[in-house]
Amino acid sequence: MVDKEKIEIAVRMILEAIGEDPDREGLKDTPKRVARMYEEVFAGLSQDPSEHLERYFTEEHEEMVLVKDIPLYSMCEHHLLPFYGKAHVAYIPRKGKVTGLSKLARVVEGFAKRPQLQERLTSQIADAIMEKLNPRGVLVVIEAEHMCMTMRGVKKPGSKTITSAVRGIFATSVATRAEAMALIGHQSPLRD
């Protein structure tokens, strides 16, 4: 549970620390707005995103399932600045155990809505799917632009960070991994 009152106090102190008047017209409601925003963007802290995968069904399908271009928004834990982009999630069911496609998007969203590192986010999604669905394999690729690289520091707008997590058959079979990467629209940079 987010303590909005503490956030409001902290935001007011930050405004004062940078030389602003937190009581001026344009800023007087800013602490409340920021507290509500943090409650929304960090909603994943109060949930276990893998619970979305507890509902599944058996289908006669043991080929690749890929949901690509899932929009995601998260906050870099180093600077509390946003990073945003898209996730691609592929898995190969074992014994026809599949989940709803929206559940994969909900897992991405749940893990993204917390202070994060893109590398950890990618692995958390893959590990949750492996644990809950026990598929033959999982591949997760995330492409994101980080505001901590765009608006401060090196100031390189438009640069993208790409991370991947490969589990099961995607880690052991070059052909399977290459098929997934081709469907996503990337050439596989990974080799056995």
Curated annotation (Swiss-Prot):
InterPro entries: GTP-CH-I_C/QueF (IPR043133), GTP-CH-I_N (IPR043134), GTP_CycHdrlase_I (IPR001474), GTP_CycHdrlase_I_CS (IPR018234), GTP_CycHdrlase_I_dom (IPR020602). SUPFAM superfamilies: Tetrahydrobiopterin biosynthesis enzymes-like (SSF55620). Its EC number is 3.5.4.16. One of its GO terms (biological process) is tetrahydrobiopterin biosynthetic process. PROSITE patterns: GTP_CYCLOHYDROL_1_1, GTP_CYCLOHYDROL_1_2. Zn(2+) binds at C76, H79, C148. Pathway: Cofactor biosynthesis; 7,8-dihydroneopterin triphosphate biosynthesis; 7,8-dihydroneopterin triphosphate from GTP: step 1/1. It is an enzyme of class 3 (hydrolase). Keywords: GTP-binding, Hydrolase, Metal-binding, Nucleotide-binding, One-carbon metabolism, Zinc. Pfam families: GTP_cyclohydroI (PF01227). It catalyses: GTP + H2O = 7,8-dihydroneopterin 3'-triphosphate + formate + H(+). GO terms for cellular component: cytoplasm. One of its GO terms (molecular function) is GTP cyclohydrolase I activity. HAMAP family: FolE. Toroid-shaped homodecamer, composed of two pentamers of five dimers. This is GTP cyclohydrolase 1. It comes from Carboxydothermus hydrogenoformans (strain ATCC BAA-161 / DSM 6008 / Z-2901). The lineage of its organism: Bacteria, Bacillati, Bacillota, Clostridia, Thermoanaerobacterales.
